[in-house]
Amino acid sequence: MLEIGFCTLEDQCPYLKDKRSRIEYNYIENCPKEINNELIKRGWRRFGRYFSRPICKDCDECLSLRILVNEYNFSRSERRVVNKNINTKVILRTPNLSNEHLFLYDKYHRFMEEKKNWKRYDLSFKQYYNLYVDGFMNFGYELAFYIEDKLVCVDLIDILEDGISSIYCFYDPDFSYFSLGKFSLLNEIQIAKKMNLDYIYLGYFVKKCQSLSYKADYTPNEILKGTKELFENEVLWEK
């Protein structure tokens, strides 16, 4: 298992305008599922063959959050979202790359650029592959959502030993009625329940960032306390 670690230089934080960020990376060529799981439990995120976590000076606003699947019950509004999507086709498969994927990805980010002032980058086939397809091994999947044979949402996930790691989701803003972002997460929860998995690892919750603060609405949940290195015995999560 080839592993290469490195860090970025300090830069503008993408989530909080008044903060600076620094990211630690681990490139792992053929990461076993159990190592992926241990890294995710310790606050790392996987994109392709790269694992990353923030190591920012004087800031700990990025908090790893996970949903407690066994205690999670769908609310009335969440059941309405499921009912609205009664005819939405959902396919669980290994990560794909197509013109359809890239078009949908670009459309979603153009919308977010206008709505939330996100920085948008044109992504090539190779860049998309490196970020969302490469390194899927025996744990990486995508949930592909179709309405009338049109790809309207892609939710990239890792199915691990104790839960599902939610990597990235993008959808067609023209289908906002269907609440596809929320519907994709509800599908993750349903899959985890069927597979007797304990957690949905949602990545980072940042209270002052609108794009990430919503994660706390999914309760019950737990927050990772502190940063633990790989193979340290105790990893503390608290409600």
Swiss-Prot record:
One of its GO terms (molecular function) is arginyl-tRNA--protein transferase activity. GO terms for cellular component: cytoplasm. InterPro entries: Acyl_CoA_acyltransferase (IPR016181), Asp_Glu_LeuTrfase (IPR017138), N-end_Aminoacyl_Trfase (IPR030700), N-end_Aminoacyl_Trfase_C (IPR007472), N-end_Aminoacyl_Trfase_N (IPR007471). Its EC number is 2.3.2.29. It is found in: Cytoplasm. It catalyses: N-terminal L-glutamyl-[protein] + L-leucyl-tRNA(Leu) = N-terminal L-leucyl-L-glutamyl-[protein] + tRNA(Leu) + H(+); N-terminal L-aspartyl-[protein] + L-leucyl-tRNA(Leu) = N-terminal L-leucyl-L-aspartyl-[protein] + tRNA(Leu) + H(+). Belongs to the R-transferase family. Bpt subfamily. PANTHER family: ARGININE-TRNA-PROTEIN TRANSFERASE 1, ARGINYL-TRNA--PROTEIN TRANSFERASE 1. This is Aspartate/glutamate leucyltransferase. It comes from Campylobacter jejuni (strain RM1221). The gene is bpt.
